[in-house]
Structure formats: C-alpha cells, structure tokens
Amino acid sequence: MVHVFQLGSKVALSVISPSTMKFTNILLSIRSSKVRRAIFRKYSKSMYEHGEREPPCLDIIMRWNSTLEMYQEALKLRYVLSCTIVNSIIAAYFIDSMFNIDYWNHIQAMEQWLLLPARICTYLSGSKYPTLSLASLAFNGMLSHCNNKI
C-alpha cells in the first residue's frame, strides 16, 4: 500500500514539477564523472567546515522519500552545486543547466511540497498495518494536497 502511495506521489511530482527529471540528470552527470565529482569535492571542501562532501544521492523510485532527501541535501549544498556547474573546466557540459535564485526557490518549494507525502509514507509504513479507513484518509489527503498545488 505504501509503495503504491509513494509511486503516486512521484507521478504527482512529475506533473507538478517536470524539472525534477532535469535536476536528477544534473546530479547524475556530476556523480558519474570523476572530473566533475572532483570539482564538486574541491568546492565543498573550501565552502564547508565539515570538509569534503559527496554530491547528493539520486532519487530512486523504489526508495521511499528519496526525492525529498535528494532535494534536502541539494539545498544544503546549493552553493557547491552552483559553483560546480559554472566551473570553467566543465561549464560547457552544463550550458543549458544554469541555476539561478528562482530555480533554487522552485527546488525549495518542491521540497516543502514533499514533506506531507513523506510523513504519510513514513506513518503508513510503520510497525502497525494501516486500516483501510486510515489508508483512505491518507489517499484523500494526498489528492487534496496535489489538487491545491495544481
């Protein structure tokens, strides 16, 4: 039941925010290249007192709340990601992916939107099996949440 709910929230997110896939692809391209990952680490080491950081993990359709976690981590590392993308060595690769303040505001809004589905998924996947009436309330609440955003 929770898996279906999670899949539904991912589909709703793709309708509300088609840029989610673009953002995932940007993170994928940073994570998949040794050079881009090294540049990311260099910036993270110089910008954060905790030292070197890895790029945010990608959202995975099978892992609950992974899109929320991806957005939360990316927002923490937004300056590092922005610097990595405009780095002169790799900037040509990201020519159409420049982040501005509006894009980060959009990411933050999507992160806020995902908080309710994450709470519902976490609750429904708890140790007690949810009743049908509870699941119905959760689904109705999520439909209302989606309709308010659209």
Range-by-range predicted roles:
Residues 1-150:
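A eukaryotic "domain-edge + linker/cap" signature
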